[in-house]
Amino acid sequence: MSAQEASKPTGWSGHQNFTMDDLAAMQPGLARIMPEIGTRYWKLYYAAKENNWTLAHFQLKEIKELMEFGMVTRPKYEEHLDTFIKDDLGAIEKAIKAQDWNAVDAAFQQGITNANDYHQLNNKGFIVWKLPDYPPPDIDLTPQD
């Protein structure tokens, strides 16, 4: 190990020391984040359809946070992610706050179109997200409040 490497701050994981460069390299890109976003987008849709506005809003908030994280770890996508958050998720949020299922559905469908357009713009046109035609089986969508 060089003197320069030895002087870099490290942190112990319980298994080994990691430098800041090691930690930076481990940060997930959109290939790891987007599947979670897709799952939450799916849950948001069916939660709203069942009038579980609290769960729908929670999923929306989590999607925003994941996209914001993606803007940090993959800044080349920042502009498109930011636009999607402001425009598409903004329209969905407005509809959720109004508890307007028809507006949620319309904004959600537009979001799918726009997301797939972003995939095309970023040379990832082979990724075409679609809404499953059934609700997620791993969560009770019944309103709890």
Regions found by a protein language model. Name each.
Residues 2-145:
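C-terminal-biased regions
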